[in-house]
Amino acid sequence: MQVLVRDNNVDQALRVLKKKMQREGLFREMKARSAFEKPSEKRAREKAEAIRRQRKLARKKLQREGLLPAPKKVLRPTR
């Protein structure tokens, strides 16, 4: 993975690198590989993730159809 450092701005380059790693799922994989996961625990985790994904898709579908209100956006203060 490669990140360009512009004008010796290392902080910005680190933020970009961290965002890229997050998108690629590197942090999740490193956490998963740090310790052995029993096959039964892996199945349970994957099943829970699948259920979570299905609920999220169903919720989004209902929101698109207008049966559920859209989530309220949180206004964050500007810098």
UniProtKB/Swiss-Prot annotation:
GO CC annotation terms, alphabetical: ribonucleoprotein complex; ribosome
Return one Gene Ontology term, BP aspect: translation
Q: Does the keyword Ribosomal protein apply?
A: yes
Q: Which UniProt keywords apply?
A: Ribonucleoprotein, Ribosomal protein
Q: Where is this region: Disordered?
A: 57-79
What terms describe the molecular function in GO for this protein? structural constituent of ribosome
Keyword Ribonucleoprotein among UniProt keywords: yes
Family of the protein in this entry: Belongs to the bacterial ribosomal protein bS21 family.
Classification via NCBIfam families? S21p
Q: Identify this protein by name.
A: Small ribosomal subunit protein bS21A
